Amino acid sequence: MNRDLRLGLSLAVLVFSGALASCTTDSKLREADLDRLRSWYPGNYTNVAQVEKDMAEGIADVREPVNILIIPVAALAIGDNVFYVQQSDAMNPQRILSQRIHRFEKGPDELTLIQTILTLKQPERWRGGEMQPDLFKGIRPDDVQAGPGCALAWTFLESKFTANCPVVAEGQTPLRVELTIDELRLADLSFNGRVKAVPSRSADPLYRFERQ
């Protein structure tokens, strides 16, 4: 084997080894992000404090007072990292505004976590599931359908998760989510899951849900 060929092979091995090490590092980082998300995401949240602040400041379009309950569920037919998410009227908790299934997985590029929001085809069938999480062990792919909006790409930096739509269609308001250890922040949403812009809240467009 001549010297140039040996040198070429050595360089190829170094490049391959470097790429492999980078992929391994990215995979470990995303696994650490998943572990953190599994710890931070579940909980009881409410935006009542923000609603009271809106009212005190005389904002024209006061946000709806909403409670959000997020619990991990063992819905293995849907995915490995699955949560049941229920929104209810904070003034009347028996009034359920939405029920969703949220699934998280590592992105194909190992650089982000991807969140898919699924709609339950028969939401009444799963009502009360927050008290009986084992109920979701029986959920199947044909019990859900893709929800409105995009899959969200999550990244973790400086003690905060941030999630955005990787691709935003023309005319669509970008969806944004932020998660810290004690607060969940969401873009202005109507409860069909679509983003709605509210001009009077442009200075502070995020719903701020404090962990209870």
What do these predicted regions represent?
Residues L76-A77, F83:
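Long, well-structured alpha-helical subdomains associated
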Residues L29-G58, P65, V82-Q212:
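Calycin-type beta-barrel ligand-binding domains and close structural analogs
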